[in-house]
Amino acid sequence: MIIGTTQPTSFMTYPNTQLFINGQWCDAAAGESLAVFNPATGKEIGRVAHARIPDLDRALQAAQKGFETWRDMLPVERNKIMRKAAALMRERAADIAAMLTQEQGKPLMEAKGEAMIAADLIEWFADEGMRVYGRIVPSRFNLSVRQMVIKDPVGPVAAFTPWNFPINQVVRKMAAALASGCSMIVKAP
């Protein structure tokens, strides 16, 4: 019996990853980075910027600044942006899967499935963001009194993602926050 494996043609050189703060890729303030290893080979495949407190402070300032704009955007506009992100996720699913396989050791088909499901999640939350309504609640004690519930974005949200589902878990958190008008700070594995 012959057992063979195939690699997709989309396997690429793993990128050295910087921090994404205020819409720009940047090195960590201290210039530190950590090695990323392929778990199948044990070889270093790239480096990732190692954020410290000054980087977190910059990210929080940027998230607060972004929140001031994002929260005032109409839900239909946020929906369009998020649907574009979902389309890009689908378009780049093979490359995303290749990187996940290299850095996580995740089987290629599972990695591609994770990217595709993440795109579905982004769309679902984008559509839910169109339905963030308030409500009127009658008083339990006085029928002439009503309470109005207004749902407002609360501000920047922090999200941490585990190593085993690094895309899906962060997308579940990020898409919900963005759809409701909040900005994000994400700590990946």
Question: Which ranges hold each PLM region?
Answer:
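Short glycine- and Lys/Arg-enriched binding-loop motifs that mark or flank ligand-binding interfaces
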Residues: 19, 27, 101, 130, ...
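Glycine-rich loop-to-alpha-helix module at the N-terminal edge of alpha/beta enzyme cores
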Residues: 45-132
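Conserved small-residue-rich beta-alpha loop and adjacent elements
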Residues: 135-189
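A short local loop/turn or secondary-structure capping micro-motif enriched for an aromatic residue
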Residues: 35-36, 53-56, 167
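Hydrophobic face of amphipathic alpha-helices that form TPR/SEL1-like repeat modules
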Residues: 1-40
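Small/polar loops that bind or transfer phosphate-bearing groups
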Residues: 28, 48, 187-188
